[in-house]
């Protein structure tokens, strides 16, 4: 492993983690619900961006750029572990409706957002 790739992932992760903290906190504060919309929002946003950039990085490939943005920043922005913890916490509280909604929305919306990001890239750049 080349040291500059590790530095790129770490730098991207630093930025992505800060963005996740700010965006998810802001969205959650705006929401009048106990449902984890902050986590959902960063997962959907990150999925849209990764869909768009996946096609970009197919043609403009510098390993450190992909490591910085895809692995580092978007890996830290999106958060499967927090989604899992919030889901388990709802399970333990017997909130079955919220559990099903959380799982369904995260999976469905993230897949759709990735597809929309790819579609936008194709529309803009052919």
From Swiss-Prot:
Subcellular location: Cell inner membrane
Record membrane topology: Multi-pass membrane protein
InterPro entries, A to Z: FluC (IPR003691)
Residues binding Na(+), per UniProt: 75, 78
Molecular function per GO: fluoride channel activity; metal ion binding
Transmembrane feature ranges: 3-23, 37-57, 68-88, 101-121
Protein activity control: Na(+) is not transported, but it plays an essential structural role and its presence is essential for fluoride channel function.
Taxonomic superkingdom: Bacteria
Coiled-coil boundaries: none
An annotated GO cellular component: plasma membrane
Alphabetized UniProt keyword annotations: Cell inner membrane, Cell membrane, Ion channel, Ion transport, Membrane, Metal-binding, Sodium, Transmembrane, Transmembrane helix, Transport
GO biological process: cellular detoxification of fluoride
Main location: membrane
Catalytic activity: fluoride(in) = fluoride(out)
Function: Fluoride-specific ion channel. Important for reducing fluoride concentration in the cell, thus reducing its toxicity.
Family: Belongs to the fluoride channel Fluc/FEX (TC 1.A.43) family.
Protein name stated in the entry: Fluoride-specific ion channel FluC
Organism encoding this protein: Sulfurovum sp. (strain NBC37-1)
């Amino acid at each position: 492993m080349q040291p500059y790739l590790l530095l790129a992932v770490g730098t991207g992760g630093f930025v992505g983690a800060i963005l996740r903290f700010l965006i998810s906190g802001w969205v959650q504060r705006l929401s009048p619900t106990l449902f984890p919309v902050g986590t959902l929002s960063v997962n959907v946003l990150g999925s849209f961006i990764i869909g768009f950039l996946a096609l970009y990085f197919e043609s403009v490939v510098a390993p450190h750029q992909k490591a910085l943005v895809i692995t580092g920043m978007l890996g830290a922005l999106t958060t499967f572990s927090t989604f899992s913890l919030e889901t388990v916490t709802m399970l333990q509280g017997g909130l079955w409706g919220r559990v099903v909604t959380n799982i369904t929305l995260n999976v469905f919306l993230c897949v759709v957002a990735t597809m929309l990001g790819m579609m936008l890239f194709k529309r803009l750049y052919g």
